[in-house]
UniProtKB/Swiss-Prot annotation:
Substitution effect: residue 435 to R: In DKCB3; shortened telomeres; disrupts telomerase localization to Cajal bodies resulting in misdirection of telomerase RNA to nucleoli
Subunit structure: Component of the telomerase holoenzyme complex composed of one molecule of TERT, one molecule of WRAP53/TCAB1, two molecules of H/ACA ribonucleoprotein complex subunits DKC1, NOP10, NHP2 and GAR1, and a telomerase RNA template component (TERC). The telomerase holoenzyme complex is associated with TEP1, SMG6/EST1A and POT1. Interacts with the chaperonin-containing T-complex (TRiC) complex; which mediates the folding of WRAP53/TCAB1. Interacts with COIL. Interacts with SMN1. Interacts with RNF8. Interacts with histone H2AX.
This protein's name: Telomerase Cajal body protein 1
Origin organism lineage: Eukaryota, Metazoa, Chordata, Craniata, Vertebrata
Positions carrying Phosphothreonine: 489
Keyword presence, Ion transport: no
Length: 548
């Protein structure tokens, strides 16, 4: 059920028909060269020093035109991580009950860098992200305790809409805060990943400031439809070697992008039984950052982040007419147990041991293909959502035979509609195809044992497909938009409109935008309480939000 794929490699780690012409380096490119001697490369930045950045962030694509099609040139230098092989994990969890005392092994203390690591390549000057060395870090709360509060309508702060209006059929496909909260990553139908910095106005304590429209500091162009994307699990902007993003697109390898320069750092390639390149449908880094888990049809492939290329461990999820069938569409790791969950378009959920991928449980209950998974911080519960399915299901690993409870949301299309939990696990937030954002308090179950809705508001009139809660500030990010298929118009003598085409989208209100909402109290005068629910100051395109 588990095999190791170690086929002989060409010098460039891929067949000749997959190699594009070498790309011209970006002006901000790191001095990496595939044929360069590592001794000639400058040493990496000191671990304790934050990257020194330009006062003006770089706006615009940092990827050369040659990277837009085919497979960008991969780097021969492996990704530098501070983690070795995974430690020994706890014994396999018995059938459907998990021990509450089982936990992931503690990280081993980082030793001194080896000579090879000390002479490794420099990973970029860091001109994309803003320098926060003189400002309070996003993850450092200082003397202020920021907590999410949904007792009032969230206040709109800022957003981005002009960036996505250049193409008439463009729309957002989700957003994700970086693990350290310094920036946010978006995906859209134009096959571009964009990185936005945290609005600098948030650092003006004690001042009334106007929020300007957000502008991306990096654009990373993929060659085709992006299937999935994710941040490195231990990403920190203070350590450039941990600041990168993984993405997978149709008929392309898995790409690792530098979050400071927008350049390609490495590629991971998977091949089918015909030795043809196949794309991953889902991506997830392991909690310790040493492995990248990728979902394929009836298979999960595990790559080592220290060895880019095609070498990987293949873990079958379906064999001998048993197991989890279908494309593995989403993967999530438990924060407290040595296991991970997989959702498939075959409407099933599977639990697997982290160390060897052995199956622990197979669950079913959704009416459509699974599109998103999220674990509760306690590690005992996880949530699942599916396409064309009006239910969010909560599962308890200690009694995983059936859902603990379900919550209602409107999902009427095949689009991936995200949901998220705040860092404490108290609030569950979900988007919907109607545009409404719903909030539940998971710590306050109602009379029937399931959480009661706390708030529901309408940030815009189009589909809200992405929601993401900031890891340390009470900031909610929402992404909107959907693919619209023209509908046939009415014909006949009565009510016929002259000049109206046979196919029309006149009944659809298109709004493609990224928006940030303040969902907390106001310890200082920079975010006053008495402005809750007011129109944001990000421009005339800014949203107000309506209670439902």
């Amino acid at each position: 059920m588990k095999t190791l794929e170690t086929q002989p490699l060409a010098p460039d780690c891929c067949p000749s028909d997959q190699d594009p012409a070498p790309a011209h380096p970006s002006p901000h490119a790191s001095p990496m060269n595939k044929n360069a001697d590592s001794e000639l490369m400058p040493p990496p930045p000191e671990r304790g020093d934050p990257p020194r950045l330009s006062p003006d962030p770089v706006a615009g694509s940092a990827v050369s035109q040659e990277l837009r099609e085919g497979d960008p040139v991969s780097l021969s230098t492996p990704l530098e991580t501070e983690f070795g092989s995974p430690s020994e994990l706890s014994p396999r969890i018995e059938e459907q009950e998990l021990s509450e005392n089982t936990s992931l092994p503690a990280e081993e203390a980082n030793g001194s860098l080896s000579e090879e690591e000390a002479n490794g390549p420099e990973l970029g000057s860091g001109k994309a992200m803003e320098d926060t060395s003189g400002e309070p870090a996003a993850e450092d709360e200082g003397d202020t305790a920021w907590n999410y509060s949904f007792s009032q309508l969230p206040r709109f702060l800022s957003g981005s809409w002009s960036e996505f209006s250049t193409q008439p059929e463009n729309f957002l496909k989700g957003c994700k805060w970086a693990p350290d909260g310094s920036c946010i990553l978006t995906n859209s139908a134009d096959n571009i990943l964009r990185i936005y910095n945290l609005p600098p106005e948030l650092y003006h304590e004690g001042e009334q400031v106007e929020y300007a429209e957000m502008v991306p500091v990096l654009r990373m162009v993929e060659g085709d439809t992006i299937y999935d994307y994710c941040w490195y699990s231990l990403m920190s902007s203070a350590q450039p070697d941990t600041s990168y993003v993984a993405s997978s697109s149709r008929e392309n390898p898995i790409h690792i992008w530098d979050a400071f320069t927008g350049e390609l750092r490495a590629s991971f390639r998977a091949y089918n039984h015909l030795d043809e390149l196949t794309a991953a449908h889902s991506l997830c880094f392991s909690p310790d950052g040493s492995q990248l888990f990728c979902g394929f049809n009836r298979t999960v492939r595990v790559f080592s982040t220290a060895r880019p290329g095609r070498d990987c461990e293949v873990r079958a999820t379906f064999a001998k007419k048993q197991g989890q069938s279908g494309i593995i569409s989403c993967i999530a790791f438990s924060p407290a147990q040595p296991l991970y969950a997989c959702g498939s378009y075959g409407r099933s959920l599977g639990l697997y041991a982290w160390d060897d991928g052995s199956p622990l449980a197979l669950l079913g209950g959704h009416q459509g293909g699974i599109t998103h998974l999220c674990f509760h911080p306690d590690g005992n519960r996880f949530f699942s959502g599916a396409r064309k399915d009006a239910e969010l299901l909560c599962w308890d690993l200690r009694q995983s035979g059936y859902p603990l409870w379900s919550l209602g949301r409107e999902v009427t299309t095949n689009q991936r509609i995200y949901f998220d939990l705040d860092p404490t696990g108290q609030f569950l937030v979900s988007g919907s195809t109607s545009g409404a954002v719903s909030v539940w308090d998971t710590d306050g179950p109602g009379n029937d044992g399931k959480p009661e809705p706390v708030l529901s508001f309408l940030p815009q009139k189009d589909c809200t497909n992405g929601v993401s809660l900031h890891p340390s500030l009470p900031l909610l990010a929402t992404a909107s938009g959907q693919r619209v298929f023209p509908e046939p118009t009415e014909s006949g003598d009565e009510g016929e409109e002259l000049g109206l085409p046979l196919l029309s989208t006149r009944h659809v209100h298109l709004e493609c935008r990224l928006q940030l909402w303040w969902c907390g109290g106001a310890p200082d005068s920079s975010i006053p309480d008495d402005h809750q629910g007011e129109k944001g100051q990000g421009g005339t395109e800014g949203g107000v939000g309506e209670l439902i």
